[in-house]
Amino acid sequence: MDQYSSSLVDTSLDLTIGVTRMRVEEDPPTSALVEELNRVSAENKKLSEMLTLMCDNYNVLRKQLMEYVNKSNITERDQISPPKKRKSPAREDAFSCAVIGGVSESSSTDQDEYLCKKQREETVVKEKVSRVYYKTEASDTTLVVKDGYQWRKYGQKVTRDNPSPRAYFKCACAPSCSVKKKVQRSVEDQSVLVATYEGEHNHPMPSQIDSNNGLNRHISHGGSASTPVAANRRSSLTVPVTTVDMIESKKVTSPTSRIDFPQVQKLLVEQMASSLTKDPNFTAALAAAVTGKLYQQNHTEK
């Protein structure tokens, strides 16, 4: 039996021989790769730290550069600005302008001063707005206010808040006088005209010029003006020009009182002129005064 068994051929296969050899052969490359990976990781970490340090240094240098540039700009601005702010006589200004090439700077400075002055003048003109109320008849639709000045109408329109139209006037002396006027009836009372003045006249009232000229002519002829009317009309008949212009006699000897021309306010004169022109008794009183004066003059000459 033992002999028979020993004579048989062993046909079994050892399947584990090759695998064991492959494992033994693969062990050395795996460890080498792990070591290489660790080395590369360490190097990468080191490079990352170096890059972070470089970025920090770059930011610090950039910040320092910006601060230096700002300081340089401020220093240059301080060096250039004092000649502009300094106020010196005309010769020093001319010299500084010549040194800096300041012809353009001088002209620009003058232009800036002119613009500032113009803006201030425009602001002052805009602030001078006045409003005056005039009593008229409701049937009057002309929207004309007799305030002593001459006006030119250049427009009219209807507003939303008032059924009455609004008329626009400008001074007859325009463009030398830039005063404008808006006239419209009051919403509460249609018999009241509301005149809004924008600006201030730069010339005297035409009626004042005529009255002063008439008074000068009368005084040069040696005459004296009088107003023999009732006491309640005396105050309103002291200013009219007609009485002064028509009486130029050299032989008036009756004791009369001389006309007084006080310096009244413009608003008072405008109100007085408006009330006199609309008073129906004013014409009759003026005619009576002139007739009485002419009669007195003829009686004295005889």
From Swiss-Prot:
One of its GO terms (molecular function) is transcription cis-regulatory region binding. SUPFAM superfamilies: WRKY DNA-binding domain (SSF118290). SMART domains: WRKY (SM00774). GO terms for biological process: defense response to bacterium; defense response to fungus; negative regulation of DNA-templated transcription; regulation of defense response; response to molecule of bacterial origin; response to salicylic acid; response to wounding. InterPro entries: WRKY_dom, WRKY_dom_sf, WRKY_plant. It is found in: Nucleus. It comes from the Eukaryota. One of its GO terms (cellular component) is nucleus. Residues 140-206 bind DNA. Transcription factor. Interacts specifically with the W box (5'-(T)TGAC[CT]-3'), a frequently occurring elicitor-responsive cis-acting element. Belongs to the WRKY group III family. This is Probable WRKY transcription factor 40.
